[in-house]
């Protein structure tokens, strides 16, 4: 049961008014044991070894938070959320130097006019597409598309963001965001923007979204600390994108959808186009593009048991001197057993096979064989070879 503290009704005798407030403490603890057939340093094509280790946040990121609302009257509420992630294996904060790395925002919500929030939060690109992302359909963090390249598992949040989300109108919801870079002399440097829409009606759901993240380092280069899409480094760094860390901008476009056949079977699918745009200061010279398609099938044979299987295929374009474009095929399985309303056991398994070539850490001129990197890049390390097998067993508790 969530621990909800309802503030007593505030008697404002002088004004003759009453207001009701609520604050909720909530969290998730997710810890397990994981295996990788090859674990290597980012950018390395050698020295990878098998490893068995404690893992955390595989099914859902460990976190604690506070969220609340105050009734302002007339159907309007003031809302806020403060949320921090942590490593449940050792107690460390998930992001150094940030007290609330997962969310920190305040805003106003009205059932008729929608919601406006300001602060550190998700982009609409993720918020509205998430219901049909591969990791929300029971494949865990290992089910993210390679390196979470398309950010449908959202490995970052946006600072300084203003987000408007419409009310649900006949199944449709739209949302837009702009995040101010705050860089003197340039409104574009470090800024981010995103738009998205979804439609959910009965067993059918569809969503489409776009986002662009600008580097605060003019012309590209090391991802600037003032970039709104920043949390101790460039967003989205993995074995897939390592050679393109100096991009002037990142942009993503994706379409997701799902259909529930009945109470036991449902399916989701997604397609994304990701572009890392080169600038004068980048270590690569052509815009690098990746296209990814994926599908997840979910089956619930018992009330307490959920099974899922997923497949995705990612292919890069030939650019930056590469003649054999990188490709990644990933297969996923997952099993989740519900012990109670708040507690469950999970098992996840994945296999990925890479092909072609990509850029190494030094960018253009450092062409290397593409190596496998399963999942979102936070819960595993890249392989030093073309293939990688990974799996985990864990327990998750929500409060």
For the regions a protein language model found, what residue spans apply to each?
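Outer-membrane beta-barrel "beta-signal"
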Residues: 339, 383-399
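Outer-membrane beta-barrel domain signature
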Residues: 51-55, 89-95, 149-152, 182-186, ...
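Outer-membrane beta-barrel architecture
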Residues: 9, 65-67, 105-108, 163-165, ...
